Amino acid sequence: MRYPWFRLAIFIVGCLFPVWWLYEAAMNLLGPDPGKIMMDRLGLGALTFLLVTLSMTPLQKLTGWSGWIVVRRQLGLWVFAYIVLHILCYLFFILGLDWGQLAVELRKRPYIIVGALGFLGLLVLAVTSNRYSQRRLGARWKKLHRLVYAVLGLGLLHFLWIVRSDLREWAIYAFIGAVLMVLRIPAVARALPKVAR
C-alpha cells in the first residue's frame, strides 16, 4: 500500500469529527436540537470532503506528488459516508422515521429532492469506485465519474436553498468549487505544471 501514513491521517480525520460531535451531543453541548446540529455539520462535512477530493488532481499537477491522487478515492468514500450519516440524522432526528411525513416534507422543502439527487449521484460513484468497475467500464468509467461535477452543483444548490439569507458561508464553498472547476479547463490544467516550475 502506497503512502500508508497519509491514508491513515485521512482515516483519523474522517472519523474524528463525527466522534467528536457525538461526544458533544452526549455532553449536551449542541443546544436544544442536537440532531439538527449534527445533520447540518455532517452535510457541511460532506461538502468539504467533496471539495478536498476535487482539489487532489490540481494539487498533483502543481506539485508532481502522486500521493494526492492515491488518496482521492478514499476521500470520495468519506464524502459518501458523511452523506449517509447526514441522511440518517434527517430520517431519525428530523423525520422521526415518520414515512408519511416524508411526502409532506418533499412538497414543502424541494431542496430535499435536490439533496436526494446528489445522494443518488454519489451512490453511483461510490459503487463504481473500484478496480473491477474501472476494468468493466473501460473508457466509460472516466465519463461516468464526471458525475462528481453535477453532484457538486447539486450540493451547492441544496446548501443555497437552505441558507437563503446569510450567504457568506455558502459563497466561500461556491467560490472554492468555482476555482476547482476553472482549474479543470483543459488550457488551465495544462498550464498548472508550468506554474509549479
From Swiss-Prot:
Disulfide bonds: none annotated. Part of the MsrPQ system that repairs oxidized periplasmic proteins containing methionine sulfoxide residues (Met-O), using respiratory chain electrons. Thus protects these proteins from oxidative-stress damage caused by reactive species of oxygen and chlorine generated by the host defense mechanisms. MsrPQ is essential for the maintenance of envelope integrity under bleach stress, rescuing a wide series of structurally unrelated periplasmic proteins from methionine oxidation. One of its GO terms (cellular component) is plasma membrane. Its main location: membrane. The gene is msrQ. InterPro entries: Fe3_Rdtase_TM_dom, MsrQ-like. Its cofactor is FMN; heme b. GO terms for biological process: protein repair. It comes from Pseudomonas putida (strain ATCC 47054 / DSM 6125 / CFBP 8728 / NCIMB 11950 / KT2440). One of its GO terms (molecular function) is heme binding. It is a multi-pass membrane protein. The keyword Nucleus does not apply. HAMAP family: MsrQ. This is Protein-methionine-sulfoxide reductase heme-binding subunit MsrQ. Keywords: Cell inner membrane, Cell membrane, Electron transport, Flavoprotein, FMN, Heme, Iron, Membrane, Metal-binding, Transmembrane, Transmembrane helix, Transport. Pfam families: Ferric_reduct. Belongs to the MsrQ family. Binds 1 FMN per subunit. Binds 1 heme b (iron(II)-protoporphyrin IX) group per subunit. The keyword rRNA-binding does not apply.
